[in-house]
Regions:
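Anion (oxyanion) recognition and catalysis
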Residues: 1-2, 144
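Conserved acidic, metal-coordinating active-site core of Asp-based
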Residues: 2-117, 121-122
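Mg2+-dependent phosphoryl-transfer enzymes with acidic/Ser/Thr/Gly-rich catalytic loops
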Residues: 89-172
C-alpha cells in the first residue's frame, strides 16, 4: 500500500537536496536545498550518491523490509539511523564492504586480515566481508546475530577497548 507520509531526499556530489516535508522532520540539520518535491529540489543532473526515503508511519525495520521487497533488484537499500524510519538507497553493490574491499586491495591487505566494526544494517556486508566482523553490543539485532563476535557498547567505548587490545604487542 502506498504510504503518503513518505518523503524523499538525496545526497549528491553537490550537497543535500530534499522535499520540504523531509527536512521538516529531519533530526539532523545540514545545509540543504529544499523544495516541494525532490524533483524540483534537484537542479539538472547531479551525481546522486544516495536516495533517502523517510516514513512517519512505519517502524525502521518494517520500512526497510517494505522498501527491499519493492526495490530489491533496483537498488541496495539499508538503514543506519536507530529509531528513525529512514531508508538509504544506492546503486546495487554500493555499500561499505565494496569500498573497504577496494581500499584493502589497493594496499595488498587480504580480507582475512581485516577487522571491521559495525552497529547498524548498513554495516552488515562489511562485517560479512571482513576476516573478523565485530558488532557493537548496543547495535542492531541483525548485526549482533551475523557478527563473528560482539564488543562492548558505544557508551562503554567498546570499539576503542577492542582496538587497543588487538594492537597490544607481545611482551616476551
Amino acid at each position: 500500500a502506498l504510504d503518503r507520509t513518505v518523503s524523499f531526499g538525496a545526497e549528491t556530489l553537490e550537497g543535500f537536496f530534499w522535499e520540504h516535508a523531509f527536512s521538516e522532520r529531519a533530526e539532523f540539520r545540514a545545509e540543504v536545498h529544499a523544495a516541494a518535491t525532490l524533483e524540483a529540489a534537484l537542479p539538472g543532473r547531479l551525481g546522486v550518491v544516495k536516495l533517502l526515503a523517510r516514513s512517519d508511519t512505519l517502524a525502521p525495520d518494517a520500512f526497510l523490509a517494505a522498501a527491499r521487497a519493492e526495490l530489491d533488484e533496483l537498488v541496495s537499500a539499508t538503514h543506519s539511523a536507530p529509531g528513525i524510519a529512514l531508508v538509504e538507497m544506492s546503486a546495487p553493490g554500493v555499500h561499505k564492504a565494496a569500498t573497504l574491499a577496494e581500499f584493502a586491495a589497493s594496499r595488498g591487505v587480504a580480507p582475512a586480515d581485516v577487522v571491521a566494526f559495525g552497529d547498524m544494517p548498513n554495516d552488515l556486508e562489511m562485517l560479512q566481508w571482513a576476516g573478523l566482523g565485530l558488532a557493537v553490543a548496543s547495535g542492531h539485532p541483525s548485526l549482533l546475530a551475523a557478527a563473528d563476535g560482539v564488543v562492548g557498547a558505544c557508551d562503554d567505548d567498546g570499539v576503542a577497548a577492542t582496538v587497543e587490545r588487538l594492537l597490544e604487542l607481545p611482551t616476551d
